[in-house]
């Protein structure tokens, strides 16, 4: 590979871990952005994320995207 191309590009994953706050009780918990199962709040049991075949549909508020 010629020197003018520089570094080899490595694809980064589009999925992330995210911290979500429950709108009912205020509990914060970490979930996966592409969750394949229903994610419920550990305190009150409300559904925070529903799978859609791609990215999960979030019902809570995203606080932080973890790297």
From Swiss-Prot:
Cofactor(s) of this protein:
Zn(2+)
Q: Which residues bind Zn(2+)?
A: 22, 25, 41, 44
Which UniProt keyword terms apply here?
Metal-binding, Ribonucleoprotein, Ribosomal protein, Zinc, Zinc-finger
Show the InterPro entries listed in the entry: Ribosomal_eS27 (IPR000592), Ribosomal_eS27_Zn-bd_dom_sf (IPR023407), Ribosomal_zn-bd (IPR011332)
* Zinc-finger keyword on record: yes
Q: Which GO terms describe its biological process?
A: translation
What are the record's GO terms for cellular component? ribonucleoprotein complex; ribosome
> What Gene3D superfamilies does this protein's entry cite?
Zn-binding ribosomal proteins
Give one GO molecular function term.
Answer: zinc ion binding
Free-text cofactor note: Binds 1 zinc ion per subunit.
Q: Which chain segments does UniProt annotate as zinc-finger regions (C4-type)?
A: 22-44
Family membership noted in the UniProt record:
Belongs to the eukaryotic ribosomal protein eS27 family.
Q: Which PANTHER family match?
A: 40S RIBOSOMAL PROTEIN S27 (PTHR11594)
What binding partners and quaternary form does the record give?
Answer: Part of the 30S ribosomal subunit.
Name of the featured protein: Small ribosomal subunit protein eS27
């Amino acid at each position: 590979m010629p020197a003018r191309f520089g570094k080899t590009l490595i694809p980064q994953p589009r999925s992330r871990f995210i911290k979500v706050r429950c709108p009912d009780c205020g509990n914060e918990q970490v979930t996966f952005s592409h969750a394949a199962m229903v994610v419920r709040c550990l305190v009150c049991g409300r559904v925070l994320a529903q799978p859609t075949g791609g990215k999960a549909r979030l019902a809570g508020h995203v606080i932080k995207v973890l790297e």
